Amino acid sequence: MTNNLKVAVIGSGISSLTSAYFLNQKYDIKLYEKNDYLGGHSNTIDINYNGKNIAVDIGFIVFNHQTYPNLKAFFELLDIKIAKSQMSFAVKILEKNLEYAGTNLNSVFAQRKNLFKPAFLKMLRDILHFNKSASNLLNQGVDLNYSMNKFLQDLRVGNYFSQYYLLPMASAIWSTPLEKIGDYPAQSFVRFFKNHGLLTVSDQPQWYTVDGGSKQYVNKICENFSNKISLNDEVKSIEVLSNLNSRNIKIVSTKGEDFFDKVIIGAHSDQALKMLVNPTDLHQQVLGNIKYQKNLVVLHKDSKVMPQNKRAWASWVYTKYDDSQNSSNIFQNLPSNLAVSYWMNNLQNIDQNYPIFVSLNPKQEIAKEDIFHQKIFEHPIFDSQAIKAQSRMQEIQGLNEIYFCGAYQSYGFHEDGISSALRVLNQLYIKAPWQ
């Protein structure tokens, strides 16, 4: 049963889709999406690989039950089929001829020479030292100005640990250049690591992927309001009119204009700010203080992005190239210290006879005939300025009946997106069945 209030939902990532799914049960909604597909970072690409049809995700790929409780509950409500995934991490440093993975002892010492390398062995000891010290840090008072760089200096860990373990792993997780990771507030960084079981060698969570690709859940969510979705329809402006009548929020988009009582913006914070006509100082201070990093995502079949030593292959591979590796093709002008590849066969249980990879900002040349798809994604950079902006998000929620949701409000992951949507829904007196 719906009332006559009209609500606009802008964007179709997990935050917007969650909002629209539950708002549709109470209000008359309209969802705007500027792209020609729904899902935002949930982007499944259907490819033909030597005659075999394969669905591959290039954005959202995996989740677990412990640290994604709302996503787990939503998938169960939607009856989404999931499959176990295998999460592991590897590092490939070309200038040092260094390759290793954290899967097991055999992969840690994939290069047997590292058994006799003091710096590498110290790195392993530093991992244990960091894990213990990081847990202690969480018991101290919060200081957003205490950065990861300062924390690592205080721990006196070796360069191998910082440059070839911790910062590459974090860079891969947050899709952020290595040189910017050190600016992250240490406690926020460590809290994420602890919540995801990254401060312990044992007790790792079981990871899952959506069977058939993330498009399965996107399609299921949209079933009940497919006639209320406007694709290829970018919102140009959102203006709050001075009249006190109902539907006093005017939206101008690619396809025309419409009027609403409430608006939920699930776009990135910088995009949301640009949409607002005459934003308040509060909007500027909160939405304007989160920066974003452009990253090129390439879906391809070139196994050269993986370690040369097969023992060091893992689901996520961070690669650091030397300067001579920078190619002169479309991959130039990308973050100098961020190149990550995902082994999709391992992550999404794809037939190993069809090697398939997703690479973020690859520096080496990938033959055009090996590329299936490529796309630019933007990821938030969680420096101290962003963390402070996050803490003030509630100050702008509901101002002039405009609300904001998005994974940028926390750590940038799917659980953060859905959680932000639930906070907005709760403010509108709507609760999910599992709440």
Language-model features: locations:
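N-terminal Rossmann-like FAD-binding beta1-loop-alpha1 element of flavoenzymes
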Residues: 5-31
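Conserved flavin/dinucleotide-binding core of flavoenzymes
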Residues: 46, 101-103, 329-435
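Mobile amphipathic helical/loop "lid" adjacent to a hydrophobic cofactor/ligand pocket
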Residues: 65-183
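Conserved Rossmann-like nucleotide-cofactor binding loop
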Residues: 15, 37, 270
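Helical element adjacent to the flavin cofactor pocket in flavoenzyme catalytic cores
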Residues: 189-249, 253
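Mid-domain catalytic core of redox enzymes
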Residues: 234-378
